[in-house]
């Protein structure tokens, strides 16, 4: 590794964010570190949506991919988050890596992934998880755990042999960010914060330091 590369890596990992030219570069570095240090699910993120009354809802989901177009997760379309994203396709995300004392906040617009993308990801899931996606009516009232187990057994019998197709009501979303903020803990609450902004995906990012 060259001296320049070592210096840039040090800047990215030390909280000196001047080396980062776009948020995806810095996010990739932080996620790689979280993958090494977090005991569970470094790709876990809080997803915030709003209902028809403007009241917020937030829950933890797993990021299943990201690139320059945004951050991807999957769920049932008829779930509470799915209904809220259909009615108001805007959302916020929060990654918090306690072991690194860092967090990343993201806001942006939401679009469904393509059927081909959803099919490809669903095919990678364990078969029991695929069966669960068919058996669950996510966010709907459930009579009992036994009723759910019966539904799982029924689906498992149907797909005892062969591949399990993706349920028509199960898919994914991509959050295309317009704002990404990185926060790094410092002693005495003198934290580091840097914010990236853009109005549209076609525009370049602007970078601003923020007071803690």
Swiss-Prot record:
EC code(s) of this entry: 1.4.3.5
GO biological process annotation, one example: pyridoxine biosynthetic process
Cofactor: FMN
Described function: Catalyzes the oxidation of either pyridoxine 5'-phosphate (PNP) or pyridoxamine 5'-phosphate (PMP) into pyridoxal 5'-phosphate (PLP).
Organism: Rhodopseudomonas palustris (strain HaA2)
Binding positions for substrate per the UniProt entry: 64, 121, 125, 189-191
Pfam families with a match to the protein in the record: PNP_phzG_C, PNPOx_N
Protein's name according to its UniProt entry: Pyridoxine/pyridoxamine 5'-phosphate oxidase
GO molecular function, one term: pyridoxamine phosphate oxidase activity
Pathway info: Cofactor metabolism; pyridoxal 5'-phosphate salvage; pyridoxal 5'-phosphate from pyridoxamine 5'-phosphate: step 1/1; Cofactor metabolism; pyridoxal 5'-phosphate salvage; pyridoxal 5'-phosphate from pyridoxine 5'-phosphate: step 1/1
């Amino acid at each position: 590794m060259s001296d320049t590369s070592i210096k840039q890596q040090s800047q990215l990992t030390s909280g000196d964010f001047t080396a980062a030219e776009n948020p995806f570069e810095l996010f990739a570095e932080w996620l790689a570190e979280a993958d090494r240090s977090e005991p569970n699910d470094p790709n876990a993120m809080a997803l915030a949506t709003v209902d028809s009354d403007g009241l917020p809802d937030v829950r933890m989901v797993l990021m299943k991919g990201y690139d320059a177009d945004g951050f991807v997760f999957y769920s049932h379309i008829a779930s509470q988050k799915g209904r809220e994203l259909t009615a108001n396709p805007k959302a916020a995300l929060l990654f918090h890596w306690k072991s690194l004392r860092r967090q990343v906040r993201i806001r942006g617009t939401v679009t469904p992934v393509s059927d081909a993308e959803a099919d490809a990801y669903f095919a990678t899931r364990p078969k029991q998880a695929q069966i669960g996606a068919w058996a669950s009516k996510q966010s709907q009232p459930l009579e009992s755990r036994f009723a759910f187990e019966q539904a799982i057994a029924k689906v498992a019998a149907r797909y005892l042999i062969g591949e399990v197709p993706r349920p028509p009501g199960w898919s994914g979303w991509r959050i295309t960010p317009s704002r990404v903020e990185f926060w790094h803990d410092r002693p005495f609450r003198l934290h580091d914060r840097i914010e990236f902004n853009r109005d549209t995906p076609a525009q370049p990012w602007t970078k601003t330091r923020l007071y803690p």
